[in-house]
Amino acid sequence: MEVRTVEGGFIGKGLRMGVVVARFNDLLTGELLKGALDCFERHGVEEVDVVKVPGSFEIPLVAKKMAESGRYDAVLALGAVVRGETKHFDLVANEVAKGVANVSLDTGVPVIFGVITVEDELQGFNRAGVKSNKGFEYAMAALEMADLMRKMEE
């Protein structure tokens, strides 16, 4: 029996990346963006376009526009949703997750869900720079998926 395993790598040379980032909760999203850009630079990505949107809820529409453009090998969606006293947190978090997944499925372009959902700002800071930077990790997923899709087309 012959088994062929296909995996994506982390070499960014020749890849074009799109990033859509929410301005709301910018103390957190700004750090996620820094982490993502650091990752892309360290892995040789030469072309990155960053588009800023008002909040996380607006991410799927812009991610779709970017994915449909044919310009990007992957799109990274960055945002931060912090729980408040109302159900707004659950509604936004769920709809953004569904929207991002649908964009990826509808376009065939990897769209990475890089929206942190946290109970409070301290938890957010722990995910966006103090203990680790999820932006870097999400960018790694974008690299891997872009390379995987390229390999699957060979």
From Swiss-Prot:
Active-site residues annotated for this sequence: 88 (proton donor)
Record's keyword terms, sorted: Riboflavin biosynthesis, Transferase
Pathway: Cofactor biosynthesis; riboflavin biosynthesis; riboflavin from 2-hydroxy-3-oxobutyl phosphate and 5-amino-6-(D-ribitylamino)uracil: step 1/2
Residue sites binding (2S)-2-hydroxy-3-oxobutyl phosphate per the record: 85-86, 127
Single annotated GO MF: 6,7-dimethyl-8-ribityllumazine synthase activity
Domain of life: Archaea
Transmembrane segments: none
Binding site for 5-amino-6-(D-ribitylamino)uracil: 24, 56-58, 80-82, 113
GO biological process terms, semicolon-separated: riboflavin biosynthetic process
Gene3D superfamilies noted in UniProt: Lumazine/riboflavin synthase
InterPro entries, sorted: LS, LS/RS, LS/RS_sf
Catalytic activity line of the entry: (2S)-2-hydroxy-3-oxobutyl phosphate + 5-amino-6-(D-ribitylamino)uracil = 6,7-dimethyl-8-(1-D-ribityl)lumazine + phosphate + 2 H2O + H(+)
Record-listed E.C. numbers: 2.5.1.78
Protein family according to the UniProt entry: Belongs to the DMRL synthase family.
NCBIfam families in the record: lumazine-synth
Protein name listed in UniProt: 6,7-dimethyl-8-ribityllumazine synthase
